[in-house]
Curated annotation (Swiss-Prot):
Keyword Mitochondrion: yes
UniProt transit peptide range: 1-33
Highest taxon above the source species: Eukaryota
Keywords: Lyase, Mitochondrion, Tetrahydrobiopterin biosynthesis, Transit peptide
Pfam families noted in UniProt: Pterin_4a
Family stated for the protein in its record: Belongs to the pterin-4-alpha-carbinolamine dehydratase family.
Job of this protein: Involved in tetrahydrobiopterin biosynthesis. Possesses pterin-4-alpha-carbinolamine dehydratase activity when expressed in a bacterial heterolgous system.
GO CC terms in record: mitochondrion
GO molecular function terms noted in the UniProt entry: 4-alpha-hydroxytetrahydrobiopterin dehydratase activity
CDD domains recorded: PCD_DCoH_subfamily_a
InterPro entries: PCD_sf, Pterin_deHydtase
Protein name (database record): Pterin-4-alpha-carbinolamine dehydratase 2, mitochondrial
Keyword field contains Nuclease: no
């Protein structure tokens, strides 16, 4: 179910609609969906360790759909950093990113080599546009004159959440080839 539907379902009080009647109504209307979800492989779906949806309900992440998801606002008192094992599982879905452990804080890290200093700033602008639309902001570093480095983690909890992987997946989809240095071909 989508994250938008869950808060509405949980906000219905028992006196308004009995749970059995609600389930039967949903089941009758969406038999195909219920049948399909009951047949899904556990290998293709992982429970998010963030548990950080607006409703407080757990979110489920099909590992292939990170870039289509939207970052959700953090409620620091209910949100916990994911374990290193959970982070390793999701890391497979964000090609090119590495896990870094900085003073017991897990972070996502990636580097690019750009053509020039100004191309690095252009790169940052493209990342900033995504970060603003997601409401989740990475640390951006321009090291030397052409090394772009990005670190992502959820600052409010001092660790990684699903939001960090969503942002990394969206950064991976950026069209930045025009900004990157071409690798020299061995002769």
């Amino acid at each position: 179910m989508s994250r938008l539907l869950l808060p509405k379902l949980f906000s219905i009080s028992r006196t308004q609609v009995p749970a059995a009647s609600l389930f039967n109504n949903l089941y009758r209307r969406h038999k195909r969906f219920v049948h399909w979800t009951s047949k899904m492989s556990t290998d293709s779906v992982r429970s998010s360790t963030t548990g950080g949806s607006a409703s407080g309900a757990r979110t489920f992440c099909s590992l292939a759909d990170l870039s289509t998801k939207k970052c959700v606002p953090c409620n620091a008192k209910d949100l916990r950093a994911m374990t290193e094992q959970s982070a390793q599982d999701l890391l497979q879905k964000v090609a090119g990113w590495d896990l870094a452990n900085d003073n017991d804080t897990l972070k996502l890290h990636r580097s690019w080599r750009v053509k020039s200093f100004t191309k690095g700033l252009d790169f940052f602008q493209r990342v900033a546009d995504i970060a603003e639309s997601e409401g989740h902001h990475p640390d951006l570093h321009l090291v030397g004159w052409n090394n772009v480095k990005i670190e992502i983690w959820t600052h409010a909890i001092g660790g990684l959440t699903e939001n960090d992987f969503i942002l990394a997946a969206k950064i991976n989809e950026l069209q930045v080839e025009d900004l990157l240095r071409k690798k020299k071909v061995a002769k």
